[in-house]
Amino acid sequence: MKNRLGAFVILLVFFSAELYAGGFQINEHSAKAMAMGGAFTAVANDASAIYFNGAGLTQLTGTNFLIGTTAIAPVSTFRGVLPNVTEYGTEKKIFFPSHAWVAHRFSDNIAAGIGFTTPFGLETNWDPNWVGRYLAIQTRLFVFTISPVVAYKLSDQLSVSAGLVYSWANVKITQKNPQTPFPGDAFVSLEGNDNSSFGYNFGLMYKPDPKLSFGVSFHSQIKYSFEGTATTVGASQLASQLPSGAVTAKLTTPINLTFGVAYDVLPKLKLSADFQYVGWSSYDTLGVDFADPSFTDIASPRLYDNSYIIRLGGEYKLSDMFELQAGIYYDKDPVKAEYVNPSLPDANRLGFSGGIGYHASENLLINVSYLFIRSSELTVTNSKEYYTPGNSPFNGTYNSYANLVSISLSYSL
């Protein structure tokens, strides 16, 4: 029984382990920011500042709206080691996480805003009969947040902000499980929800000179507790050995601390840079609890390193009607290679982006951008995962990439 249950728990552990570090995290909360490689902490000059750096809201005037969506098309492949070198790929799907922001300047010193976004919102789907079916078939996560933010201008040079984050989420993960000595595989599924979790954020914007700005943004941990049901379809003789019934899994996302700088090197050219620190080492245990006392609750250690993202961006004002943006970023994966799992394969990533802004009228700005993300090829030779419990390590080579297209509409009153 322990091995059969263990395979299911491994899926829970690695689902939690890689969702935030890997491709499930969505940083694209406005088309303009995406075009600039996400180097927006010291720019934050539209309503999406609610997410990137709330202190930037004091730069705005009147009432500002920003809505948009991003089409994300991720692809992952796995190829085993000799002699099993067949290449398997995830199902090709397009996802549309969206964002909406509204901000208002109440006085010279006070601004506020509220926004909706999807910080996680993708899934991976492998063929139900692929070689890694005992590790992962479907992994799906959707997390939504609503965040009100208040900003205060302390002086002509310095602004600060504070915000609350209300979040809810849905998760579904499936795999197969061997049911020796009976033929075929058991099918295991877990689906759960977290209906109410909270976090907070702070921002700071310092402009010692009209051409130069510094930004700091802090996003707290958010503690999720997924409550759901595990369902197993398999041989009735093994029903007591495979997980079923109510289950909870706790997950805490790490802090994010970002430092940014932006400088107008020319009257029409702005360059920006961000350093984003992700505090993974603060989360050391994943807890999985079963309502059925015949299954032992699990407390699984986390073997993670802190990580970081380096972002560079630029914007050029081509004319009164058009602006061009470009960016690049490097995202360091905190997951050790031996713990990479096909539920969410990932590695160090490079992102290359570009976009255009079109002022359709005095009040309306349309931004369109494109981002290509390429994960470095990752060959695992010492995997802690196994084809089946007690079998050969799940060694092989992962490749992942994604194409993203985003559009945002900004309107000011």
PLM features: residue spans?
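Sec/Tat signal peptide C-region and signal peptidase I cleavage site
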Residues: F15-A21
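Outer-membrane beta-barrel porins/channels
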Residues: G22-G37, G62, F78-Y88, I94-L413
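Outer-membrane beta-barrel pore proteins
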Residues: T41-N45, I50-T63, V102-F106, L154
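Glycine-rich nucleotide phosphate-binding loop and flanking beta-alpha elements
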Residues: T58, A73, F120
